[in-house]
Amino acid sequence: MRKLGPVTIDPRRHDAVLFDTTLDATQELVRQLQEVGVGTGVFGSGLDVPIVAAGRLAVRPGRCVVVSAHSAGVTAARESGFALIIGVDRTGCRDALRRDGADTVVTDLSEVSVRTGDRRMSQLPDALQALGLADGLVARQPAVFFDFDGTLSDIVEDPDAAWLAPGALEALQKLAARCPIAVLSGRDLADVTQRVGLPGIWYAGSHGFELTAPDGTHHQNDAAAAAIPVLKQAAAELRQQLGPFPGVVVEHKRFGVAVHYRNAARDRVGEVAAAVRTAEQRHALRVTTGREVIELRPDVDWDKGKTLLWVLDHLPHSGSAPLVPIYLGDDITDEDAFDVVGPHGVPIVVRHTDDGDRATAALFALDSPARVAEFTDRLARQLREAPLRAT
């Protein structure tokens, strides 16, 4: 979706920002970016296009922002699949910048803010070793939320080959007997439900656009459901357009179209991303990114964070103190859940290197889905033993 007004550069999603050389008053913004570890560079006209500038910084376009006052710079960035394109309207060219592919248009760089306060994944304490974490969770009843791919399951080359990590099902069964649990996935609801295979828990598919409660009650976001026919059309167009690209998989889901490029040639990824972002603009959808995937979904203000809060509100709870939400996830879309959990719960990121040592809103970390299974098993055991310790 194209929009106007203030925009935020997020070090969780962006590794660098490229400015065209005609822009002035960039010094303060550059200083803010450098303080949070986001690189900066410039590009000019002619052959010095944004993709060349990104190469100089050794950053992927999919994790890079372009800021340009000219249609040529915006167009070049869109054709190369950059993550965020900010147009700067200095001469009344707002509409042209939007047509050429700007994600947002500002009139002054003071409208661009920089997110602060996050830490790099490598800087976080291990959730299994953090002193007092487990005891604090046992003292108050937790509600535990899991992502699937990269959290309960290892990331694999073929998404259809992803299943629970060894020991995860048994650990989930033990934990579900002690506290509410939910699996929130970007996969279709039926898909993630089958892959986990544990009855009597919450499942959310398509980043929360569709859910089932432990009793089987089905819920869906009706505003998002209106986009289902459009997503079907976009999926067909992308399959035709990207079919000749070896290693690219277009996955049509009920509430989304995921384009996986993990097995594609690196020099074709920009074209893949550009095709998806063009479809976003053509069909008035929204783009999200993840680990070697770019996805179209309904342009509705809903995400895993809002889903988590909705589920919390629907959980039965007899105690006087509120439930403590724990969220475990690995991907960019999980950051929305970390944001809402952080003030009063426990956000845990599962480390990986697909996006380098990126920033995260999580407060703790685990190193792999195997460690997630271990953490889950340990928490279940401590919850089981808590009444014994109290007597």
Curated annotation (Swiss-Prot):
* CDD domains to which the protein is assigned, alphabetical: HAD_TPP
One Gene Ontology cellular component term attached to this UniProt record is: plasma membrane
State the Pfam families in the record: Trehalose_PPase
What are this entry's molecular-function GO terms?
Answer: magnesium ion binding; trehalose-phosphatase activity
Classification via InterPro entries: HAD-like_sf (IPR036412), HAD-SF_hydro_IIB (IPR006379), HAD_sf (IPR023214), OTSB-like (IPR044651), Trehalose_PPase (IPR003337)
Q: Which reaction does it catalyse?
A: alpha,alpha-trehalose 6-phosphate + H2O = alpha,alpha-trehalose + phosphate
Q: Give the pathway listed in the UniProt entry for this protein.
A: Glycan biosynthesis; trehalose biosynthesis
Q: Which GO terms describe its biological process?
A: dephosphorylation; trehalose biosynthetic process
* Activity regulation annotation text: Inhibited by EDTA and calcium. Diumycin and moenomycin stimulate activity at concentrations of up to 100 ug/ml, and then inhibit at higher concentrations.
The record's listing under SUPFAM superfamilies reads: HAD-like
Q: How does activity depend on temperature?
A: Thermostable at 50 degrees Celsius for at least 5 minutes.
Q: Which cofactors? A: Mn(2+); Mg(2+)
Active-site residues annotated for this sequence: D147
What is noted besides the main data? Was identified as a high-confidence drug target.
Protein name according to UniProt? Trehalose-phosphate phosphatase
